[in-house]
């Protein structure tokens, strides 16, 4: 029953498309152009793959069209107001920065707004066990763990690098509405845009985020689950300058504070959707107090106070005063930048494959993860690098850039690496979202062990970068 | 070299670390920092002492402290942190003494009120709020207060439930407290001490008092969150209802009835 009605509903749509195709000769002609490569999505992953393709001599002459649904005007004119920082900030690992430097992007990123950090403390909010990473001891003098960079800063740098590149078209405020393959197009993707035009292409790259339309059009499944957790982000002001990152694991999810220049900090508080909504509704003073509580008080305290917002300003200062000063806890947060609080549902999803004939997926389109390891954007950077190299190698040989044979090295390089990382992050999330005393005890032993055994720590650090 | 030690301290705090005494600083004036071994010795020693002489209040108190840490006292504090009144208690940290409670005023309160029931009970048993021992072996100052509060509230639990301080009454109350607070010491007493009962006492304890105590202890609200100083005027029956506690049958009356039957 159900199936037949869906079929009935689907069939006219198919017919309509076919009719529309067959009348293209007589009707006012919708323009169909060709682009060797079409990148859908102007996020960090999409812009990076475009910049990489325009870097290599083998691919620089390939025509590339980048289509972005949103407007890029804000990004292009985004200027350095040192009294404001964006709420979407990512920690770029040294290897991401290394590649961005190589393809000429990093020099366009505003470095006054990037904060390097060399020290990181993670601790268990239930047992207090902690692990500390210090790169000066581990990776040698002068190495950084990561670089806190606003997503806007990175995207702005990427756009600057892409400005005036040959054979590159950036279409913003344009939506990809469908993808078709017809015999006339030799089964290559025809990308239908909201401006009425169609682009035929040899390689369609989906860098179109977690709900990737390209993935859907290509019939690639993405499997995983909802964490039933929201990531609340905010830009906060700290009492003094910091060069350290902190993460405390609470039963509701981890809360992380990462340093930005000029006494700013980037907050990512993963918690229940309900609590995230409550936290967004607090007054700025209450919110600041709650963030300080979340780094210092017991989980019970935090949950009680969020449920009783009118007691935050009366009860919380007393509870905080009872805590003896703990050097591992970040310095007090003194303010929250207005309109900087936002929250995102967190999901763990992995596409069954990253490639199909004439199609490749990169970034969040291929995988999404919990932000607790700060790896989401970095994984996309790794994808872009690997895919660009695969395309370059094929172009150098004069091979078809869209064939699965060309794309396979990319999949082989990234899929299992990403899969392992997604798994580890997923297990960490599960391990730390329980209050079971036995599990708390065991995981604390684990964390203490990690903290005291140098080789284990070295291994983890080398995995993280 | 040597510090002057308050006369009341059981084990003199030594600055140097020994097998039993920890060398970490005191968290509050009466605090006696112990090592894990010290804590174990204290628990075993006071446990034996209590088993043979449960009237040694100091030993009972010590056993309670030695077994509450590190886990259970935090759980009890957590119960307080989940409740607005419990949090206020932690903030204000009121102490109960014969002065702070003004026993004469309580004697003039209306019959059946918490204050009146409490003072009548004190008078009947010949005890005073000042006989409660000071907490010294709990390391966290706030948890030490939780232990102190629990101890000082104990006499109110008697008033609330109407259980007398004879062995079975005391034990039934311990069972009630164990179910309600989760502190292991009360649980220990609840299962070990009946070994010393006469058969008739044991039967009464297991048939009537223990079931009452466990049932009511588990289902009632946490009694640690009652701000006793603020409910003195309240009717005991009403407070029992608020907390979800039934009154147990009068133990002494039952003893008399049984004696008559013989
Ligand atoms: C709370 C939170 C904190 C995070 N912290 C970190 C961190 O510290 N470190 C880190 O590495 N990562 C972090 N991440 C992850 C990181 O933000 C993402 O992985 C990254 O933004 C993904 O980039 P992307 O380019 O793949 O996708 P997106 O940034 O989602 O870009 C996709 C783009 O495609 C466009 N698009 C979609 N559909 C269409 C269509 N039909 N037509 C045209 N355009 C379309 C969208 O408009 C969008 O601009 C965090 C994520 C969250 C939620």
UniProtKB/Swiss-Prot annotation, chain B:
* UniProt main location, coarse: mitochondrion
Positions with a binding annotation for Zn(2+): 154-155, 158, 170
Tell me which InterPro entries the record gives: Coq4, Coq4_euk
User: Which cofactor does this sequence's record say it needs?
Assistant: Zn(2+)
UniProt keywords, alphabetically:
Lyase, Membrane, Metal-binding, Mitochondrion, Mitochondrion inner membrane, Ubiquinone biosynthesis, Zinc
Region named Disordered: 243-262
The entry sums up its family as follows:
Belongs to the COQ4 family.
What else the UniProt entry mentions is: This protein may be expected to contain an N-terminal transit peptide but none has been predicted.
Q: What is this protein called?
A: Ubiquinone biosynthesis protein COQ4, mitochondrial
């Amino acid at each position: 029953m159900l199936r037949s009605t869906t079929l009935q509903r689907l069939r006219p749509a198919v017919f309509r498309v076919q009719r529309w195709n067959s009348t293209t000769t007589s009707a006012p002609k919708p323009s169909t152009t060709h682009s060797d490569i079409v990148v859908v999505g102007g996020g960090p992953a999409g812009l990076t793959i475009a910049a990489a393709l325009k870097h290599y001599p083998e691919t620089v002459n390939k025509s590339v069209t980048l289509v972005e649904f949103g407007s890029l005007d804000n990004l292009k004119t985004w200027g350095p107001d040192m009294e404001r920082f964006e709420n979407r900030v990512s920690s770029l690992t040294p290897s991401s920065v290394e590649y961005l430097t190589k393809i000429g992007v990093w020099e366009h990123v505003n470095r006054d707004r990037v904060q390097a950090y060399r020290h990181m403390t993670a601790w268990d909010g239930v047992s207090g066990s902690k692990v500390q990473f210090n790169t000066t001891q581990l990776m040698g003098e002068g190495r950084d763990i990561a670089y806190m960079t606003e997503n806007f800063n990175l995207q702005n740098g990427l756009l600057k690098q892409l400005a005036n590149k040959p054979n590159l078209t950036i279409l913003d405020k344009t939506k990809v509405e469908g993808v078709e393959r017809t015999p006339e197009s030799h089964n290559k993707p025809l990308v239908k845009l909201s401006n009425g035009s169609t682009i035929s292409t040899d390689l369609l790259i989906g860098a179109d985020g977690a709900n990737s339309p390209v993935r859907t059009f290509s019939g690639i499944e993405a499997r995983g689950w909802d964490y039933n957790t929201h990531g609340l982000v905010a830009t906060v002001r700290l009492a003094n300058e910091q060069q350290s990152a902190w993460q405390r694991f609470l039963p509701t999810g981890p809360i992380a504070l990462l340093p930005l220049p000029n006494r700013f900090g980037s907050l990512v508080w993963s918690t229940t959707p309900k609590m995230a909504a409550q936290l967004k509704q607090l007054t700025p003073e209450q919110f600041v107090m709650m963030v300080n509580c979340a780094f210092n008080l017991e989980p019970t305290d935090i949950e009680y106070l969020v449920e009783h917002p009118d007691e935050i300003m009366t009860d919380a200062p007393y509870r905080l005063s009872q805590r003896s000063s703990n050097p591992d806890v970040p310095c007090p947060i003194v303010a929250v930048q207005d309109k900087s609080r936002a929250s995102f549902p967190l999901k763990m999803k992995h596409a069954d494959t990253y490639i199909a004939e004439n199609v490749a997926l990169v970034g969040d389109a291929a995988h999404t993860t919990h932000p607790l390891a700060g790896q989401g954007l970095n994984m996309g950077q790794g994808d872009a690098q690997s895919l660009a190299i695969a395309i370059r190698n094929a172009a150098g040989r004069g091979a078809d850039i869209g064939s699965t044979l060309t794309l396979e090295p990319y999949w082989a390089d990234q899929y299992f690496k990403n899969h392992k990382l997604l798994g580890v992050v997923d297990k960490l999330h599960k391990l730390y979202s329980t209050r079971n005393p036995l599990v708390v005890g065991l995981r604390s032993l684990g964390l203490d062990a990690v903290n005291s055994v140098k080789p284990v720590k070295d291994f983890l650090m080398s995995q993280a970068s | 070299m040597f510090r002057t030690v308050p006369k009341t301290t059981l084990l003199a705090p030594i600055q140097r670390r020994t097998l039993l005494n920890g060398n970490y600083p005191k968290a509050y004036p009466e605090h006696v920092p112990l090592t894990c071994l010290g804590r174990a010795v204290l628990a075993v020693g006071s446990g034996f002492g209590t088993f043979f002489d449960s009237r040694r209040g100091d030993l009972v108190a010590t056993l309670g402290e030695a077994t509450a840490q590190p886990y259970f006292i935090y759980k009890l504090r957590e119960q307080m942190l989940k409740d607005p009144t419990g949090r206020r208690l932690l903030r204000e940290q009121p102490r109960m003494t014969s002065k702070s409670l003004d026993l004469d005023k309580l004697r003039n309160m209306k019959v059946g009120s918490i204050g009146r029931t409490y003072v009548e009970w004190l008078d009947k048993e010949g005890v005073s709020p000042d006989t409660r021992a000071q907490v010294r072996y709990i390391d966290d100052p706030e948890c030490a207060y939780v232990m102190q509060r629990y101890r000082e509230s104990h006499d109110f639990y008697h008033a609330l439930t109407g259980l007398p301080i004879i062995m079975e009454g005391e034990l039934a109350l311990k069972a009630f407290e164990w179910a309600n607070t989760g502190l292991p010491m009360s649980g220990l007493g609840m299962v070990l001490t009946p070994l010393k009962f006469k058969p008739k006492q044991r039967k009464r304890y297991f048939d009537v008092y223990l079931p009452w105590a466990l049932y009511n202890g588990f289902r009632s609200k946490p009694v640690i969150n009652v701000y006793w100083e603020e409910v003195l005027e309240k009717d005991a029956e009403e407070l029992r209802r608020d907390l979800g506690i039934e009154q147990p049958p009068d133990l002494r009356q039952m003893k008399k009835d049984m004696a008559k039957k013989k």
